[in-house]
From Swiss-Prot:
It comes from the Bacteria. It holds the Pfam family Ribosomal_L20. Binds directly to 23S ribosomal RNA and is necessary for the in vitro assembly process of the 50S ribosomal subunit. It is not involved in the protein synthesizing functions of that subunit. The lineage of its organism: Bacteria, Pseudomonadati, Acidobacteriota, Terriglobia, Bryobacterales. InterPro entries: Ribosomal_bL20, RIBOSOMAL_L20_CS, Ribosomal_protein_bL20_C. One of its GO terms (biological process) is ribosomal large subunit assembly. This is Large ribosomal subunit protein bL20.
Length: 130
């Protein structure tokens, strides 16, 4: 009988895969090959999901900011442009949190953005007259 040098390692690696597949349906949690395929597929989805999560949160933040901006009489793009013109550098996560939890503070930010846009517009009109 030939000598087996990888027995312990193979058993451990298979056990690891089957442990990861516990909770999967039918043979995907019992048979090594099916479990391996299911685990690989699951890991791919997990990897993609970690990348998607960033996009999804950014979209959610923008939706929340836009809703509060519309209530304050501004569009999202004008609001963000107004904040940049005012020199405020707040990220979307913070803005969405303020919009969700502190309506008065968000209205102050919207007024600040409106005034910065008005100053910028008046400066542009003054340059056009010259």
């Amino acid at each position: 009988m030939p000598r087996v040098k990888r027995g312990t390692h193979r058993r451990a690696s298979r056990k690891k895969v089957l442990a990861r597949a516990s909770g999967y349906f039918l043979t995907k949690s019992k048979l090594y090959r099916a479990a391996m395929e299911a685990v690989d597929r699951g890991l791919k989805f997990a990897y993609v999901g970690r990348k998607r999560k960033k996009r999804d949160y950014r979209r959610l933040w923008i939706v929340r900011i836009n809703a509060s901006c519309r209530a304050a009489g501004l569009s999202y793009s004008k609001f963000v442009h107004g904040l940049k013109a005012a020199g405020l550098d707040l990220n979307r996560k913070v803005l969405a949190d303020v919009a969700l939890h502190d309506d008065a503070a968000f209205r102050n930010l919207a007024e600040l953005a409106k005034s910065a846009l008005a100053v910028k517009e008046s400066a542009r009109l003054a340059l056009e007259k010259e």
